[in-house]
Amino acid sequence: MSTHDILHRLSETLASRRHADPEKSYTAKLFSEGPDSILKKIGEECAELIMAAKDGKRLNIVWESTDVIYHVLVLLAFYGLSIEDVSQEMRRREGISGIDEKASRGTK
């Protein structure tokens, strides 16, 4: 099973939970609470990932990275996006200098 396969399946599962019972699904609970709740969880999980990385504990880094990725996928699903949208953008950027790619977006 490829990394893309598991992320694609998870992305589909998350999208299917959008209207599930928040009492029975953590993902549905996040959806029902809205983007602020999802963003808060992403922030918390990123902080935990940073701490795991600072401690140099490889297994904890994997666990916390998994939590960050999960919550980012929830955010994408909340906005009707999926890992495929991110994959397409990564393919577009492949082989382009990060400096050049960022400059091509112009100012915000």
Swiss-Prot record:
Q: Which residues form the signal peptide?
A: none
Q: Name one GO cellular component term.
A: cytoplasm
Which biological pathway? Amino-acid biosynthesis; L-histidine biosynthesis; L-histidine from 5-phospho-alpha-D-ribose 1-diphosphate: step 2/9
Q: Which GO terms describe its biological process?
A: L-histidine biosynthetic process
Root EC class: hydrolase
Its EC number(s): 3.6.1.31
> InterPro entries, alphabetically?
HisE, PRib-ATP_PPHydrolase-like
The UniProt GO MF terms for this protein read: ATP binding; phosphoribosyl-ATP diphosphatase activity
The protein's matches in Gene3D superfamilies, at most eight in alphabetical order, are given as:
MazG-like
Highest taxon, organism lineage: Bacteria
Compartments where found: Cytoplasm
Predominant cellular place of this UniProt entry's protein: cytoplasm
- Identify the keywords attached in UniProt to this record, alphabetized: Amino-acid biosynthesis, ATP-binding, Cytoplasm, Histidine biosynthesis, Hydrolase, Nucleotide-binding
The UniProt catalytic activity note for this protein reads: 1-(5-phospho-beta-D-ribosyl)-ATP + H2O = 1-(5-phospho-beta-D-ribosyl)-5'-AMP + diphosphate + H(+)
CDD domains per UniProt: NTP-PPase_HisIE_like (cd11534)
User: One Pfam family name from the record?
Assistant: PRA-PH
| Protein family according to the UniProt entry | Belongs to the PRA-PH family.
Q: What is this protein identified as?
A: Phosphoribosyl-ATP pyrophosphatase
**Source species taxonomy:** Bacteria, Pseudomonadati, Pseudomonadota, Betaproteobacteria, Rhodocyclales
